[in-house]
Amino acid sequence: MDVNEYQIGGSHYGNGDYQPWDFIIDSDMHYLFGCVFKYAVRWKDKGGLQDLRKAAHYLAKAEDEYVIYGKYDHHVKMLVINPSYYAFYNAIPKPERDIITAILLDDLPTAQRTLSALISENED
């Protein structure tokens, strides 16, 4: 059985044709950005505001490694993997789509601003 045909512990990834882990692998995304991606695309279907905060936390760690320590060398297959393709086939709303695009373009400030705005909009 193909591992994409089943999910353990919920159905929060079963809503689209292109699975988050496939997109992360296909785009050669760094682990920290992959975590930002998965929490940003599933937050409405699984962990809510806590998932958005987790995404922001992983992004802050990535910024530390990338900006402060200069450890992260981010190369993404931009011509092969298009975030619009993933968003279209998985009905990803605009704010989440903007986060994905910003991560893939190494625009960490935009990703952080968009995540912060999304968190603020959804706080009680």
Positions of the model-derived regions?
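Intrinsically disordered, low-complexity regulatory regions
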Residues: 1-124
